Amino acid sequence: MLEVTLPGEGTPPAEGFRTLHSLKRDLERYFRGYPVDFDDVPVRINVSGKPREVLELVREIPYGTVVTYGDIAQKANTHPRVVGVSLARNRVPIIVACHRVVAADGLGGFRWGLEWKRRLLELEGALPSRR
C-alpha cells in the first residue's frame, strides 16, 4: 500500500547513497527530538480513492501538531472510521505521520501500539492533554 521510493535502476549510485544517507540522518535527528520535515521523501501510495486522499492529507500535518480523525474525515468528506482503517495500513509511520491523528477524546488507535504513539507525540511535544 505504501512504500518509500528510493532511487532505482538508472539512478547514479552516488545519488542513491545521498538519498539513503539523508533519510538515515533525518531519522536519527527525529528520534533525538529535532523537528524534521519528511516532505521531500518520495512515498508511493499504492491505493486509490478515500484511503489515498486520507494518507495524502496526513502527510501535510506538520511536526508537533495533532489533528483528529474527524478533522481528516471532514477534509476528505468521509467517515472517521475510514480514516482509522486507512491509517492502520500505513507502513511508513514516521514519514506518513499517522501518529499525529488522534481521537477527539484521547489518543485513538495505532497499529504499532499506543505506547509508541504516545512516545512519538511526546518526542514532538504534541501529546494531547487527558480529557
From Swiss-Prot:
Q: Note the Gene3D superfamilies from the entry.
A: Winged helix-like DNA-binding domain superfamily/Winged helix DNA-binding domain
Indicate where this protein resides in the cell.
Cytoplasm
Identify the EC number(s): 2.1.1.63
Q: Which domain of life is it from?
A: Archaea
Any one Gene Ontology biological process term?
A: methylation
Q: Does this entry carry the keyword DNA repair?
A: yes
- What is the name listed in the Swiss-Prot or TrEMBL entry for this protein? Methylated-DNA--protein-cysteine methyltransferase
Origin organism is: Methanopyrus kandleri (strain AV19 / DSM 6324 / JCM 9639 / NBRC 100938)
Q: Which gene encodes it?
A: ogt
